[in-house]
Amino acid sequence: MTREALMSTFDDRENAFENKFAHDAQMQFKAEARRNKLLGLWAAELLGKSGDAAAAYATEVVKSDFEEAGDEDVFRKVSGDLGDRATEAEIRGKMIELMAVAKGQLMDEA
C-alpha cells in the first residue's frame, strides 16, 4: 500500500468516526428532548392539565433543559412544579424510564 493510499484510509476512518460521533450526539439530544416532552406530559397529568395546557407545559419542560448542562434543570422544574405530588425518587425514576421510551420511539422512527 502506498503512503497516499494509507493516508487516505486513515482520513476515511477519521471521517467515519467524526460522523458517528456527530450522529450519536444528535441522537442523544433528540432522545433527551423527547424524554423531557414525555416527562412534561406525565407531570402535566399529575397537575391536572390536559389538551393544549398539557402540551404547553411539556414545551416548558423541554425549554427548561437549555438552562444548564445535564438533567438537573429539568428535574428542578418538574419537582418545583409538582411539589408534594411526586417524590424525588418518583421523578428521577420516571426520567430514567422515559429516556428508554424516548430512545425506543426514535429507533422505531428511524
Residue ranges and their predicted role:
Residues 2-110:
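A charge-rich, low-complexity, intrinsically flexible signal that marks solvent-exposed coils, linkers
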